[in-house]
């Protein structure tokens, strides 16, 4: 963060992005017949139940990160492969929709071009885009792994289960060792989407 003011703007934006993301996972899982998110208290718009300390710090420090995954039990689904795909997609889609809505408010000039509220709205757009893109990376526990899993053959499932056991550690080590590479790869994608939503804007 370049200043304390930036941090004040990022925090509410981060809470909005994380809450929308995880609530959407839980809502879709619940709609498909899995009571686990509701039973675990995750079918909630309270951001505190969705926060992951390390993931939240990564959003503040590195501008991408994650929330506490919503527990889902695929045994409740009629079509586990399809329904896990839908649950996995729900979070990033919700983030993109949220980014679009907040960007639309800014583009329509409904807020002053300067000020705390417009600053928060801009960060809501940026963080929602970043959270959506980052979570599409196919490494557990990120959503991209659930999406990829739906398209893999049965023969690949043992490797997937192994990766699910150690995915978080692998992801963390990659983030630490290759943070610069992540930025180089992800920044052009993020800037492209930001420019589509808010022409002339740049990612953080």
Descriptions of predicted regions:
Residues 1-204:
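Hydrophobic transmembrane alpha-helices and their immediate loop junctions
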